[in-house]
Amino acid sequence: MNLWSKIHMKKNNLIFIGMPAVGKSTVGVVVAKRLGKNFIDTDLLIQEQEKKLLREIIAEVGEDGFLEIENQVNRDLETENAVISPGGSVVYCEEAMQHYKEIGTVVYLQASYQTIKRRIKSPKKRGVVLREGQTFQDLYNERVRLFERYADVTICEDGCQIEETIEKVLEEIEKMA
């Protein structure tokens, strides 16, 4: 196998990033099925490793402790031919994001603040951790810069139904093949 084939094979994963409620898991499952790839939700891997729900982990070790666990689980994930849906806060985990850039194509599912706010009635119930004095708008603005920094492909889903977003993703992936 030549070097190009090895590189191409290593980068055959798709990693979906974006705000909570943007549809990373929903879109990811369908895209994985259509492309014949495995689907991995890293929040479930974290819960499995820690034997606790995410909110219990955060309550126990705090936001920084959770980010350490999230970084470790995402950084250590070794897989091929998969669609990976990490939690929205993975963009704070530099080692994990560098790993994802090496093993796949990072797809940013982008939606406006208004769209996300409409989908998430209560950020706290959704498990979104806000720092003292931080608003959901602040969190959105902070993360958008990171999503844009790491994205190989950006899919704007404002005004789209889920099926339209899936089609946009598949079209972009086809262009890259």
What positions do the PLM features span?
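ATP-dependent small-molecule kinase phosphotransfer cores
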Residues: 42-90, 94-98, 137
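Walker A/P-loop
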Residues: 25
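P-loop (Walker A) phosphate-binding loop of NTP-binding proteins
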Residues: 19
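NTP-dependent small-molecule kinase module
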Residues: 2-11, 30, 34, 144-177
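Short glycine-rich anion-binding loops that position phosphate/pyrophosphate groups of nucleotides
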Residues: 87-90, 112-114, 160
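A glycine- and Lys/Arg-enriched "phosphate-lid" helix/loop adjacent to the NTP-binding pocket
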Residues: 102-145
